[in-house]
From Swiss-Prot:
It is a peripheral membrane protein. F-type ATPases have 2 components, CF(1) - the catalytic core - and CF(0) - the membrane proton channel. CF(1) has five subunits: alpha(3), beta(3), gamma(1), delta(1), epsilon(1). CF(0) has three main subunits: a, b and c. Produces ATP from ADP in the presence of a proton gradient across the membrane. The gamma chain is believed to be important in regulating ATPase activity and the flow of protons through the CF(0) complex. PANTHER family: ATP SYNTHASE GAMMA CHAIN (PTHR11693), ATP SYNTHASE SUBUNIT GAMMA, MITOCHONDRIAL (PTHR11693:SF22). NCBIfam families: ATPsyn_F1gamma. It comes from Propionigenium modestum. Belongs to the ATPase gamma chain family. It is found in: Cell inner membrane. The ATPase of P.modestum is of special interest because it uses sodium ions instead of protons as the physiological coupling ion. GO terms for biological process: proton motive force-driven plasma membrane ATP synthesis; sodium ion transport. GO terms for molecular function: ATP binding; proton-transporting ATP synthase activity, rotational mechanism. PROSITE patterns: ATPASE_GAMMA (PS00153). This is ATP synthase gamma chain, sodium ion specific. Keywords: ATP synthesis, Cell inner membrane, Cell membrane, CF(1), Hydrogen ion transport, Ion transport, Membrane, Sodium, Sodium transport, Transport.
Length: 282
């Protein structure tokens, strides 16, 4: 029964692993529900900001602003890449970082700097010797809005100071518990969304002052929403990965148990045969 003992030991090992993956699945499920609620709460406000900016842009088509118009020549690109702090979430981080590499490869003649949100992105950039402009790790719900505000203020400052000529954002958009979409979005210059709006606006004190106040706030909301959606997507991916691992462990335990019972039955049958043979010889 040496083989049986090995199988029994393997069953015990897989059972221990299953307990760990099940616990992680429960924790991830709880965190996912929390961030799913935050995403749903924030989305209407983010959508309203999109509409306000679109209507405003339609009403000032002839007005110019640096955050709208961009630079005449693009030499330096900033990439904000959002990953997780921890692993065990399937291909969540690897697909995001592959998309970042595609964007870098697509701009061989430009200087590229990265703002990493999440340890996995930070560690990857350090390993690959990418120009890491800033890093933000271990974000918690209570500070996410303030961090988004800090990042948006920094990229606007970098844009005005010609440190960045364009800024891109890479993150996972949350769609449902089973579906997310990897998004690559140009943050700066801000795209003028085309809408049919013939409304005439009167600006006080001036268009320049209003845009200078509104556009950074718009970027702040865009980044905050992206952080929430990316975090919800992360916990969804980890929950699903741990569920798959738990299911696989349960299947493995069933197979090993069946194998153990067969080995045990074969050993018992062998012993009975030997006893019968011995009795016949007598």
């Amino acid at each position: 029964m040496a083989a049986g003992k090995e199988i029994k030991s393997r069953i015990s090992s897989v059972q221990s692993t299953r307990q760990i993956t099940k616990a992680m699945e429960i924790v991830s499920s709880t965190k996912f529900k929390k961030f799913q609620a935050l995403v749903n709460q924030s989305k209407p406000y983010s959508g309203s900001m999109d509409k306000v900016l679109a209507n405003l842009a339609a009403g000032i088509k002839n007005e110019r602003h640096p955050l709208f118009d961009g630079k005449t020549e693009v030499k330096r690109i900033g990439i904000i890449v959002m990953t997780s702090d921890r692993g065990l979430c399937g291909g969540f981080n690897s697909s995001t970082l592959k998309e970042m590499e595609k964007l870098i490869v697509a701009n061989p003649d430009k200087e590229v700097s990265v703002i990493a949100i999440g340890k996995k992105g930070r560690d990857y950039c350090k390993k690959k010797d990418r120009d890491l402009k800033a890093e933000y790790i271990q974000l918690i719900p209570e500070t996410m809005f303030d961090k988004a505000k800090e990042i948006s203020e920094n990229i606007v400052e970098y844009f005005y100071e010609d440190i960045f000529d364009e800024v891109y954002l890479i993150y996972n958009e949350f769609i449902s518990a089973l579906s997310t979409e990897l998004i690559v979005k140009k943050l700066l210059p801000i795209e003028r969304i085309e809408v049919q709006d013939n409304t005439t606006y009167i600006f006080e004190p001036s268009v320049e002052d209003i845009l200078s106040s509104l556009l950074p706030k718009y970027l702040n909301i865009q980044l905050y929403q992206a952080i929430l959606e990316n975090t919800a997507s992360e916990h969804s991916a980890r929950k699903n990965a741990m569920k798959n691992a738990t299911d696989n462990a349960e299947d493995m335990i069933k197979d090993l148990t069946l194998q153990y019972n067969r080995e045990r039955q074969a050993a018992i049958t062998q012993e009975i045969s030997e006893i019968v043979s011995g009795a016949s010889a007598l």
